[in-house]
C-alpha cells in the first residue's frame, strides 16, 4: 500500500532527476565542444539557475501541489480532488496544458522576466489617451479577483516616503546648487588666471630668448666679418711674401736649376687658404734648411780633404 506522501516524494524525485539530467547534459555538451570545465563550478551554476527557474516559474510548486492532491485522493481525502474534478476528468489534456504552461514559465524566467513582472503584467494594462501624452492604468479581472480575496496590500512606507519627497525644500536645494556653482566658477576663474599668468610668463621668456638669440646672431656676424678681414689680410701678406721671395731669388747669383726649383716650391704655396699656406711655407723652409745642411756637409768634406781646418765665430 502506498504511503501518505508517496506521490509527493515521487514528484520531488523527478525534479531532482531533472536537475541531474541538466548537469549531465551541460557537461556532455562542453565535452563534445572540447571545452575544459570545472565540474563543481558547472554543478553550482546549473543548480542556481535550475532552482531559480523552477521556483520563480512556479513549476515546482505546481507539480508538488498536484502530487499532494493525488496523495489526498489516495488517502480518501477527496476535498482537493473534488475541487480539481475538471483536471481529473481528462488527465492527458491537463498534463499537456500543464507542460505547456510550465515550459512558458521557465522560458520567461530564464529570460529575466521574473514572477513579479509576470504578475504585474497580468494584473494591469495601460490604455493610451488619443492626443495626449498621459495614459490610463486599467485593472484586469485577475486584479479584481485578488482584491476580492484580500490578496492586495498597501505599503505604508511607500506612502510616507512619497509624502516626504513632496515636502522637499526646493529653496535650500537651489541655494546649495547656487553655492556649488559659485564655488565651481571661482575654481575655474582661478585656474584660468593661473593659466594666463603662466602663458604671459612663457611669452616673456620667449621674447627674452629671442633677444638673446638676436644678440648672439649679431655677435656671430661681427666675428664672421672680422674673420673674413683677417683672412684677406693673411692672403695679402702671403702674396706679398711670395712676391718678395721671388724678387730676392732673381737677384741672387744662383744656378738656374736651383732658382727654378725654389720658384716651383714658392709657387706651390696656397695663397687662398691661409692654413694650407702656412703648411706650404713650413715645407719650403724645411727644404731650404735641408739643402743648406747638405751644402754645409759637402763643404766640410771638401775642407777636410784639402787638409784644412774650419771654425765658426768671429775673432
From Swiss-Prot:
Coiled coil: 166-237
GO molecular function: RNA binding
UniProt-listed GO biological process terms: regulation of translation
Span list, region Interaction with host EIF4G1: 208-315
Chain segments carrying region Dimerization: 150-206
Keywords: Coiled coil, Host cytoplasm, Host-virus interaction, RNA-binding, Translation regulation
Region feature RNA-binding, mapped onto this chain: 1-149
Source domain of life: Viruses
A GO-annotated cellular component: host cell cytoplasm
Keyword RNA-binding: yes
Protein biosynthesis keyword on record: no
Pfam families attached to this UniProt entry: Rota_NSP3
Region ranges (Interaction with host ZC3H7B): 170-234
Protein's cellular compartments: Host cytoplasm
Family the UniProt entry places it in: Belongs to the rotavirus NSP3 family.
Subunit field text: Homodimer. Interacts (via the coiled-coil region) with host ZC3H7B (via LD motif). Interacts with host EIF4G1.
Function noted in UniProt: Plays an important role in stimulating the translation of viral mRNAs. These mRNAs are capped but not polyadenylated, instead terminating in a conserved sequence 'GACC' at the 3' that is recognized by NSP3, which competes with host PABPC1 for EIF4G1 binding. The interaction between NSP3 and host EIF4G1 stabilizes the EIF4E-EIF4G1 interaction, thereby facilitating the initiation of capped mRNA translation.
Name of the protein described by the UniProt record: Non-structural protein 3
